Swiss-Prot record:
Main location (coarse class): membrane
Main function: Produces ATP from ADP in the presence of a proton gradient across the membrane. The gamma chain is believed to be important in regulating ATPase activity and the flow of protons through the CF(0) complex.
This protein's encoding gene: atpG
Any one GO biological process: proton motive force-driven plasma membrane ATP synthesis
Protein family membership: Belongs to the ATPase gamma chain family.
Keywords: ATP synthesis, Cell inner membrane, Cell membrane, CF(1), Hydrogen ion transport, Ion transport, Membrane, Transport
A cellular component term, taken from the record's GO annotations: proton-transporting ATP synthase complex
Subcellular location: Cell inner membrane
Protein name as it appears in the record: ATP synthase gamma chain
Annotated CDD domains: F1-ATPase_gamma
A single MF term (Gene Ontology): proton-transporting ATP synthase activity, rotational mechanism
Length: 291
């Protein structure tokens, strides 16, 4: 009977876990729909912005703005984005592995690397290994363009002042609910805006601008960094909630399987106990009959 009580206790514990994972799945699903809507709503603006900037960038020389100026890379800065919370499968671990691999490759090339983590998980991991610059945590659950502007301001001025020579952004690109792929994007300098916009040359519209091209690109280039960072934040948010939803759904199914296994085990133990009791009764009856 002690074995039966142990199994019943395990079933009850798994049932409680299942209730938690199911609730977390529902919460993640709701947050995912919200973050996915934000991400998809921002895409048309981002694409049109990059289209306009693309048509403008090909008309100015690389020395028209400091953000276009390429120089020999000696020191780089890496902005890496993760979630603040866990329980989202391999979402953060794949991002951290990609970031660490990229940083090690650059160090092996003889470059100095400054790391700027955005999100608690990536910050907690790298603070034990590297000196961090302008790290941020507890910002991914609720954010707007203001956060993207703040991050951009932290990285643009040091680049213009030649404190570092290249800026890279590493984040989880949203593919679908069950797939998020780490992406490495060079943000600064910006010699190939047209490639990022994915616009074929023959389809690019040639606009007439007022004021001059140089004045306008001076206004738009910082905004371009804002747009890229905000897009990465939105994709990170959607990917995190999608990954958590998938992870909690998988955990709920695992609970169902465990409950089925424990229930079968319970029935077997109970049947064995009943059989043993019946054998004792039959044996006692036969002994009385002979006596």
């Amino acid at each position: 009977m002690a074995a039966l009580k142990d199994i019943k206790r395990k079933v009850a514990a798994v049932e409680k876990t299942k209730q938690i994972t199911r609730a977390m799945n529902m919460v993640a699903a709701s947050k995912f729909r919200t973050s996915q809507t934000r991400m998809e709503s921002f895409r048309p603006y981002a694409m049109k912005f990059m289209e306009v900037l693309s048509s403008l960038a090909v008309r100015v020389s690389p020395d028209a703005h400091p953000l276009l100026a390429a120089r020999e890379a000696k020191r780089i800065r890496v902005v890496s984005m993760s979630s603040d919370r866990g329980l989202c499968g391999g979402f953060n671990s794949s991002l951290i592995k990609s970031t660490e691999r990229f940083v090690r490759e650059k160090i092996a090339e003889g470059l100095e690397v400054d790391l700027t983590p955005i999100g608690r998980k990536v910050r907690e991991y790298f603070k034990r290994k590297y000196a961090l610059v302008s790290d941020r945590a507890d910002v991914m659950s609720k954010f707007d363009m203001t956060l993207a502007v703040e991050i951009a301001e932290d990285v643009i001025d040091p680049f213009v002042n030649e404190e570092y020579d290249e800026l890279y952004l590493i984040y989880n690109e949203f593919i679908n609910v069950s797939m998020q792929r780490p992406a490495v994007v060079r943000l600064l300098p910006l010699p190939s805006v047209g490639q990022d916009a994915e616009i074929e040359a023959e389809k690019r519209i040639d606009y007439n601008y007022e004021p001059s091209d140089e004045e306008l690109i001076g206004k738009l280039l910082p905004m371009y960094i804002h747009v890229l960072i905000f897009r990465a934040l939105l994709e990170t948010s959607a990917g995190e909630n999608g990954a958590r939803m998938a992870a909690m759904d998988n955990a709920t199914r695992n609970c169902d399987e465990m409950i089925s296994t424990l229930t079968l085990q319970y029935n077997k133990v109970r049947q064995s106990a009943i059989t043993a009791e019946l054998m004792d009764i039959v044996g006692g009856t036969e002994a009385l009959a002979k006596g």
